[in-house]
């Protein structure tokens, strides 16, 4: 009764969890995205943004965030790309780490260019909301499509017979394996 706002971070939640949470508590979940190397980069910042279940929200005003494709070019709305933080052209982004401990080579490789690449894949809708797909190294290519475990899990949990599921990438990204629990309601 005293909780007024609920924020989540880490791995994204499936849309079905958002629905169930709101039905049980009457409260919306405000999702965010960040890394150990940074503070919150993208979020459903309450009360300025109406959360869209499953979306990680919009970029923090502290950061110049974009999505870049495999050719290093900015993505169009609806196109998947890697989440990047602009490093050049202004002061160092507040809350972003400044290097890897005792590893100048890795620091230069990741922080020496125009962008810091989070290695996380997302897409942006026409309203500026970002939708997390997965880690770049946690996505498989199937029939020309890039598929992340989260997308498959989200689709499966919409089915009434699935309470929970987990999708894992096996054999060096060659296939996915699915584990689920039956409807226990």
Model-derived regions, located:
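Gly/Ser/Thr-rich phosphate-binding loop
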Residues: 1-51, 64
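Thr-Gly-centered strand-to-loop micro-motif
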Residues: 7-9, 68-70, 86, 102, ...
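Active-site glycine-centered loops adjacent to acidic/histidine catalytic or metal-binding residues
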Residues: 10, 34, 57, 120, ...
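Active-site phosphate/pyrophosphate- and oxyanion-stabilizing loops and adjacent acidic/basic residues
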Residues: 19, 54, 105, 154
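Short coil-to-beta-strand transition motifs
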Residues: 55-62, 116
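Conserved ATP/PPi-binding loop(s) of AMP-dependent carboxylate-activating enzymes
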Residues: 59-62, 73-109, 147
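Residue-level recognition of short loop/turn positions
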Residues: 69-71, 80, 112, 126-127, ...
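AMP-binding/adenylate-forming catalytic core of the ANL superfamily
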Residues: 106, 119-185
